[in-house]
Amino acid sequence: EFDLEEGILDAARLTQVVVDPMNPLAYKQEKETKFRDTVVTLLIDSSGSMRGRSITIAAMCADIMGRTLERCSVRVEILGFTTRAWRGGESREAWINDNKPSNPGRLNDVRHIVYKSADDSWSRSRRNLGLMMREELLKENIDGEALIWAHNRVVTRPEQRKVMMVISDGLPVDNSTLLVNPSNFLEQHLKYAISMIEDHSPVELVAIGIGHDVTHHYKRAVTITDAE
């Protein structure tokens, strides 16, 4: 509680007193707030387009959220997603060896990363965030499958409230897949995954778009036009 006549001096309001000594000192009272038993999953796009400032900002957000929420006794899971190769991997080779049948679906191998599991302490897992910025890790992004994977991890947890936050800078892109499937193949699967979670799951889904308007896909979303 703020703007009280007695209690703990509110240091954040001291500048107002310095500027105008006629302003009264402000006091506050701290109260314990009971958080609902909560777990938060942070799912980070680890594709090549995130290279540089964007992935640095994502890592900083993960660091701040992880430390802050752990102090509030909220469990945090930090995940990432990309592909194992550029322009196809073993999936594409298997398709070629099978005489390239039509409508093959995904033709790259997904890479899903656990930087911090919900049950790990922050002190043990924090250094893993540095791996997020390794150049050789950041390749292509197949978002729909990553959402389903992250959702399936969190939905079975015992906490009462489950929140999943996605940080991404664009639509799913995998050149090998899109060359031989409809151009909206990966986007349509992403929409399906979002709809499944938003309409049929107890998990609360939110998204942050970095330089990309994700409000077209997610019901609860914000867009950051510049990673700065």
Language-model-detected regions and their locations in the chain:
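Acidic, glycine-rich A-domain
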Residues: 1-228
